Amino acid sequence: MATFFVNGQAVTAKKNQTLLRFLRDELQLTSVKDGCSEGACGACTVLIDGETCRACVPKTDALEGRHVITVEGLSDFEKKLYTYAYGEAGAVQCGFCIPGMVLCTKALLDKVEDPTEEQMRYAIRNNYCRCTGYVKIIKAIELAAQLKKAGVIPEPSEADWKLGSSVHRLDVEEKVLGYGKYPDDWYLPGMTYGSAVRSQYPRARVLGIDISKAKALPGVVAVLTAEDIPGENKVGHIKHDQYSLIPVGGLTHWLGDPIALVVAEDQETLEKAKKLVKVTYEPLPAVHGPEEAKEPDAPRVFDEEENNVQAYKHVSRGDATGAIARSKYVISKHFETPWTEHAFLEPECAVAYRDEDGYVRVLSTDQSSHTTLHECKILLGSDKVRVQNQLVGGGFGGKEDMTVQHHAALITYLTGRAVKVKLSRAESLLIHPKRHPFWMDFTIGCDENGIIQGVKASVYSDTGAFASLGGPVLERACTHASGPYNYQNFEIEGTAYYTNNPPAGAFRGFGVTQTCFAIESLLNEMAEKIGISPWEIRYRNAIRPGQELPNGQIVGPETGLVETLEAIKPYYDAAVAAGKPVGLASAMKNSGVGVGLPDWGRCKLIVEDDAKVHIYAGASCIGQGLGTVLVQMVVTNTPLQRDDIVYERSNTWIAPDSGDSSGSRQTLITGEACRRACEKLTEALKTRTLQELNGEVFYGEYLAKTDKLGADVPHPVSHVAYGYATQMCVLDRKTGKIESVVAVHDVGKAVNPKSCEGQIEGGVVMSMGYALREQYPIDDNCKPIDKFGKLGLFRAHEIPEIKAIVVDKPGLDVACGAIGIGEITSIPTAPAIAEAYYQLDGQRRTKLPLSDTPYERRGR
């Protein structure tokens, strides 16, 4: 037992526990976030006697007489100061790391009035941010120092909320001050805790499940198995091939497969009870990777499948083989890219309870509340489910699949009790789908002027233990493997294989990150072979408005690849002239689902009793700032002002289904739906006031029409729009480390330029990790890394100068010309870095993470 002070108040911790658990579970100070519980991420940072400390490390018995400060304990001046500074700098995206960053800022500024940039970077060195790339957080610290010194905090200059304005995001204050709720921040009366007992073998037959001892343990509410599921057992984003609970006689597919759900009154009892569930297995040989999966006599990951092929794609246009044979210059290379973990700061969590209407209400952190609703209804065999999105602490594609939401819904449905189901960080690293590793063989042919004549490729990937989005990822990898260039001879074959490894699925870039590394690396090598610069070969081949991509689509006037090349040229020329090692790469990425699949945006504008317009769209805000985008869309397309508008977080009973927050689609697709609703509202406002419109609903819907892959039309429209980018990397010749990155991105109409810059900076740093040192090793038992701190993520003091340049290219006739930017920010970075290292030491690197660099992690 210990007595100490929290935010100036004396408190007593009767049992010895981590400070994190005491602050959250007993005092419910939920600004202190639980990101890893292993002392790695920094999301739980507090101040102890004025010094930063990760609250998951110290035990309460060691804190006798100490003074602890959380964000809740800041002075009113400090709360206003940090809210303004972080909002003005554009430093807030998903927000999960921000309270910890704020306390690091306070600790620094309490000691140093005018900190240097090095001191600012050092102050947050122990705190990860996966969204921002740290650039704007450092700017926020700098601004906070200036304002604190001046003693005056201005009001945000946000009179104009129209498209193109760098306004503060809607959710800045609740994220900076930590009162906004993520699912784990809910503590409901009588709430129980649930967790799954998972397979001990990557591939085994479950022969028996003995739950008797676990059920008999005092404090255990229920132990559920497959026999208790009232609806269908299997779930899946596209294909229902993932057991919610493995039945007796069922086959496990990876170490994350759930077998039983334990529900208890408290977390300590929960962990004890899980150990009392006894599962009898018949271990079977596992499939460790695609090379094994290909073999005719390989074990089948799924009994019901003929082989281990999860998806096959073939894309062909023109005569690639003939064009390459006729080319003056030909290069062929093999490339490999690794597994990558999303490393979002917020582990998966869901809370469920019975609401006042008798529905199971799920409070979720996911990328589509309506997808969660669909899966839960199938599992329960009931329509009495509602899903309410909470704040989402990062996604990047990793929260598209079911992990905990359906389990929480099942527990509440069967027990009638409120429940919280949360993954530990080790479970999160195991369970949600990762970025696919790819193995790729590419051949490119060019004429004497460097004009691409043809490209031919063959790729395969490890999609792991279930389908997830493996097929669409493979398809996108193949359709974008040609690069953003104007030529017509292209062919690629792609295969995704089931294995008993953890599943792979959506990850920022959606397969394009992998094939872009190959095609852009080949283009850099080809430029050298011909004797022209990497910039020149791209400029000669760049797709321009009215031209055909290799998939046959004629691009529109909004196409801005040339503009990105022209904008980067002065920086590129200056680096070359200075004799610096510099690498260049370009990319394109679709905005919207495309390829003939359903791709809809829906939005309701409802005038409510407060005489304000409330925006309802069933689309998750996962850090990209969708709510702010939609408010700016309404201000731009109606006579209303910012104060007339309220953004409502996604739910499934009022907000219409707007599809997943993936595919860089929400700004364009749901943005256009919102614009259409605005047209109707504007017309109504010509004759009536908002008070007179009380209760009126203005509905907008947009269905993006595209052609299926392989459609028999001369110029298939694969996607409504593409974003384009060119990035360059400059190395310090002495240290071999990255000196700077310049990233130029075409976003159509920039809705919020500062927010766009933040997306770019975050994507660059994320792919620096992908290119240089992040790792997700999997051992011979198909078991992956289980420590967040060992992933190899970049920290604030390690990042180079990053210059983000936003190119405004009008022309798209939907969503006021706005194109999504979420994914393309991370796509060209790796090949640009690889080329810079070639310029440094003459070594062509074709495997990621790159070898023989100062960033290489030994013993990988």
Model segments located where?
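Signature of N-terminal electron-transfer/Fe-S-associated modules in redox systems
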Residues: 1-156, 595
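Short beta-strand elements
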Residues: 46, 174, 180, 349-354, ...
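Glycine-rich loop/linker segments at domain edges
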Residues: 90, 165, 171-177, 238, ...
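Intrinsic disorder at enzyme termini
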Residues: 124-183, 565-570, 574-578, 604-613, ...
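Flexible, low-hydrophobicity surface segments
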Residues: 145-307, 414
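C-terminal catalytic domains of large/alpha subunits in multi-subunit enzymes
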Residues: 226-227, 381-383, 414-419, 448, ...
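Phosphate/diphosphate-binding loops
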Residues: 258-259, 264-266, 417-464, 671-691
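Helix-loop-helix junctions that connect adjacent transmembrane helices in secondary transporters/permeases
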Residues: 296-378, 542-612, 692-717, 787, ...
